[in-house]
Amino acid sequence: MIHPICFPMHRSRVISFYEKTDLRVPAKLFAHPVIKPDVSNIPYPLPSALETYHCAALGEDGVVWLGSSTTGLTRYAPNEPRKADVIQYFSAERDLVDNHVRALLADGHNVWVETENGVSFIEMRLMSMEEKAAMLTKETLIGIDRHGMISHRALMRDNDITSRVPYGHCDNDGGFTAEFAIGEMMRYDVMAREKGPDSPEAQDAKRVALRAFEAALLLMYISGRGDGFVARSYITTSEILPDDGLFYRKEGDYAVCVETRASKRKNMVGKKIDASTPVPDRLAELYRSEGFSDSDIIYKGDTSSDEITAHFAAMYFAHKILGPDDPELDDLIQRATRSTMQHIVEHGFELW
């Protein structure tokens, strides 16, 4: 008999940044005496050089916060049940404004941290794995999603996911998006089984899974070549053209190789490739709904074998989980599977 794994509640870091002049910052932080801690009796390796620890604060349950003058903050929690949580490291730009810690003020399980250029409040929030997953999924959809693809995105302001830059293609767009979609499909499968397919939890998971999977599947059709060629990623004409590979701009029934260092090196600038096979409307809606047409698409050339592995894994799970109730999607999956495998075989088991 299969038994589910039950994860206990766990403290996770939630970070807030403040200016030193912000009235929400406790005045005690700046008036707190700075006393160099004795770390010689801590029976574990510490992430910063011992001589750089120059301030400390005592929290609840035996927790000791240790500030380094050069390399951030350490949390020593000898009573944590998980060994991995006994020593934790906090640094800029994720947790601190910078790594030059000046003063600490414990606040229950949490801590205020003054560094050279600002203040951080580190909340060690007790949450379930489900709560943490929901928080991370929300941040992913707000801060990383690009035309449905999930890989990475730069920020203009540290820790502010609303400041994401409006571009950011990645060679892993296909693979990472496919893998993200698999996770959301499994979430949908569990929620549908436990709470019903029409429950808000199941419908939310299905919505996220479909968008991500369709974005990954689109890369198997977007070139318009109709021969199973899989693109690595794509951008629109509103995005910055990277100079790190072969890119093709779609123009009517053709796609033209644009100028990059790679295309010049290979003497491929201006080369025309067939693009007459229509992109399925359902998948093209990912960019058309944002106001872009087929002629606004610039796709990146052939992808790699690890991306293909992720694509096929996602198609398998989509066929099993989403396909039974979505024959249109299942047909797109089967067509992509056949054409991609045929392409690989015909090209000597390579992806070009």
Give the label of every model feature segment:
Residues 77-82, 125:
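Short loop/turn segments that connect beta-strands within beta-propeller blades
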Residues 4-34, 42-60, 91-106:
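Short coil-to-beta transitions that initiate beta-strands within beta-rich domains
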Residues 154, 170, 204-352:
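Extended ligand-binding groove/face enriched in aromatic
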